[in-house]
């Protein structure tokens, strides 16, 4: 079933084609939800860009499009007469009876009117990607939950999604860590969990300091890397133990956040690195510069005005991150079974890596490794800052461990809940308190991040994110709880066969907000901005609360009761589904 916006878009395109058959290209209605209620339900702005090629005034073009729309019975059955506004905007208002019918249809539809795409294609989402032998910190939070949310939306739209965790499990750091552990904690290289991950992180710091300060240690560490790369069984066993230990600790965080990932670390691509060099050589892109193999970028210059290089093989013959990323791109777009067969590859990393990926993407494009019509995208995000506007740190100045941050969020949510229960003189079981605090705490952390435009930095504040008012997870969760309370008070939210009738302005406002859901999901799929979904859910919660506060529901007249209960149910279903796509669980009681 086509959604309202899809039906309108198709009707507008057909009308534009009939009105201007000579303009066979560029006929895009530019359909969007109306910015204000007085403009109707949708606005079509496609007349404006046609003015120049057609050499006509935009209002004249809009008039011709409207004439064709009015001659289409399917359109007149869906919409009232269009209005032309401003320089040539076409304002469209859906007929009230069609809006009511759409609400009825969504009540019986688990997808709530969001159609699966007709052109589903495999997508790779690369996110989280912590480093072995290091604990996950607050910087991993954004990549992990943004990537998870985008994967959920793409999956919901019908795309097969491969969620990849490109962990840092290879490189010089293992040479220095293994060398150091052989001397100070050899048991860690022979026995699983001989030291915990926190100790391993401390050992890593010690090894890094020795590597920076001691040339002999540097040399021994590099020899260890060579042994590891050469398949030395002792080195490989030590490496495997370190990876397994980190992997188990990472999984505890992923389980807690309800994150699904398939690990495919940097080491996976080692066998494919020589082929990257061969492929670039065959494409005549390689240039030797100071003994290193490089590809010089087009249109990107350094301060000296010369093209910047992407180094793919160092002068000592070693490979680097760029080589691994190029091998990963080749594999991800490569045809199965030798590759993933993806048509869209999305990298979710901090904005500091934007230049790196821009360079790697350009090299892959010029080498011919991105299939025609495929999409390769970097999804950058800003820093998590403290309330002082600086990078979030502990009081001791260290990076905040992710598990500590999650623990504190849940503890604060529990403190708030116990305080509220005391004020309300409510008695709840310990199981209830722990469940609600855990759900609210993690929801607050996720939503506070996802509700920000990911491109910008944001200031982390437990007080703000746990507030029951404002654009917060608790506010949205409370809207769901409010509706669940209607059912507990005797409202039958399960009935779907009632003839829906709406008369109050608050009802129509809620209807119109509910019917925007499909367009918002399509927008998030295309633009990869989860905050658009957050903004919509917040606005929906506000519109619902105004409706619920101003219009009687359980005490409504019998002829209005079923319709108002239907609105409550669809609101709850939309909030649950929308929050679920953000990776946030809901509650029936708080």
UniProtKB/Swiss-Prot annotation:
Statement: the UniProt record of this protein carries the keyword ATP-binding: yes
Reaction catalyzed: tRNA(Arg) + L-arginine + ATP = L-arginyl-tRNA(Arg) + AMP + diphosphate
Residues spanning the signal sequence: none
Motif, 'HIGH' region: chain positions: 130-140
Superkingdom of source: Bacteria
Keyword set, alphabetical order: Aminoacyl-tRNA synthetase, ATP-binding, Cytoplasm, Ligase, Nucleotide-binding, Protein biosynthesis
E.C. number: 6.1.1.19
Enzyme class: ligase
Biological process, per Gene Ontology: arginyl-tRNA aminoacylation
Pfam families: Arg_tRNA_synt_N, DALR_1, tRNA-synt_1d
SUPFAM superfamilies: Anticodon-binding domain of a subclass of class I aminoacyl-tRNA synthetases, Arginyl-tRNA synthetase (ArgRS), N-terminal 'additional' domain, Nucleotidylyl transferase
Localisation: Cytoplasm
Listed GO MF terms: arginine-tRNA ligase activity; ATP binding
Any one GO cellular component localisation term in the record: cytoplasm
Subunit structure and binding partners: Monomer.
UniProt similarity note: Belongs to the class-I aminoacyl-tRNA synthetase family.
Descriptive protein name: Arginine--tRNA ligase
Encoding gene per record: argS
């Amino acid at each position: 079933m086509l959604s309202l916006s899809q039906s309108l878009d198709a009707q507008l395109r057909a009308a534009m084609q009939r009105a201007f058959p000579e303009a066979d290209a560029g006929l895009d209605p530019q359909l969007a939800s109306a910015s204000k209620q007085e403009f109707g339900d949708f606005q079509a702005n496609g007349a404006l860009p046609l003015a120049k090629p057609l050499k006509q005034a935009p209002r004249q073009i809009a008039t011709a499009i409207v004439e064709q729309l009015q001659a289409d019975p399917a359109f007149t059955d869906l919409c009232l007469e269009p209005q032309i506004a401003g320089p040539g905007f076409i304002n469209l208002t859906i007929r009230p009876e069609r809006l009511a019918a759409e609400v009825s249809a969504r009540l019986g539809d688990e997808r709530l009117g969001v159609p699966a795409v007709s052109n589903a294609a495999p997508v790779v989402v690369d996110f989280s990607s912590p480093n072995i032998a290091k604990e996950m910190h607050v910087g991993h939070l954004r990549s992990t939950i943004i990537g998870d949310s985008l994967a959920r939306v793409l999956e919901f739209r019908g795309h097969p999604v491969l969620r990849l965790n490109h962990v840092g499990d290879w490189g010089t750091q293992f040479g220095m860590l293994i060398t150091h552990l052989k001397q100070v904690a050899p048991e860690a290289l022979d026995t699983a969990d001989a030291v915990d991950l926190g100790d391993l992180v401390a050992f890593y710091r010690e090894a890094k300091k020795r590597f920076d300060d001691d040339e002999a240690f540097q040399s021994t560490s590099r020899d260890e890397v060579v042994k590891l790369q050469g398949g030395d069984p002792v080195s490989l066993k030590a490496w495997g133990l370190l990876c397994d230990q980190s992997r188990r600790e990472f999984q505890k965080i992923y389980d807690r956040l309800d994150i699904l990932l398939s690990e495919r670390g940097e080491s996976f691509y080692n066998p494919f690195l020589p082929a990257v060099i061969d492929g670039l050589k065959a494409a005549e892109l390689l240039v030797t510069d100071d003994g290193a193999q490089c590809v010089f970028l087009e249109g990107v210059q350094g301060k000296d005005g010369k093209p910047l290089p992407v180094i793919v093989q160092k002068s000592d013959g070693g490979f680097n991150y760029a080589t691994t990323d190029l091998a990963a791109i080749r594999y991800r777009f490569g045809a199965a079974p030798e590759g993933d067969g993806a048509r869209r590859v999305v990298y979710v990393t901090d904005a500091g890596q934007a230049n790196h990926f821009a360079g790697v993407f350009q090299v892959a494009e010029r080498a011919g490794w991105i299939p025609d019509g495929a999409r390769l995208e970097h999804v950058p995000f800003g820093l998590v800052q403290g309330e002082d506007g600086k990078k979030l740190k502990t009081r001791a100045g260290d990076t905040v461990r992710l598990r500590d941050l999650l623990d504190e969020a849940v503890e604060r949510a529990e403190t708030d809940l116990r305080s509220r229960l005391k004020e309300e003189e409510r008695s709840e079981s310990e199981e209830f308190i722990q469940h609600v605090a855990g759900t609210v705490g993690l929801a607050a952390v996720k939503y506070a991040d996802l509700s920000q435009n990911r491109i910008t930095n944001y200031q982390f504040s437990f007080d703000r994110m746990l507030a029951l008012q404002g654009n917060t997870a608790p506010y949205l969760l409370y809207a769901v709880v409010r509706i669940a309370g209607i059912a507990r008070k005797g409202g039958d939210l399960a009935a779907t066969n009632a003839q829906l009738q709406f008369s109050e302005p608050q009802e129509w406002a809620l209807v119109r907000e509910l019917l925007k859901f499909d367009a918002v999901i399509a927008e998030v799929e295309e633009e990869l901005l989860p905050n658009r979904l957050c903004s919509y859910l917040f606005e929906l919660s506000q519109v619902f609360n105004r409706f619920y506060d101003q219009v009687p529901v359980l005490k409504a007249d019998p002829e209005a009761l079923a319709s108002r209960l239907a609105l409550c149910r669809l609101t709850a279903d939309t909030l649950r589904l929308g929050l679920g796509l953000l990776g946030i669980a809901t509650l029936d009681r708080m």
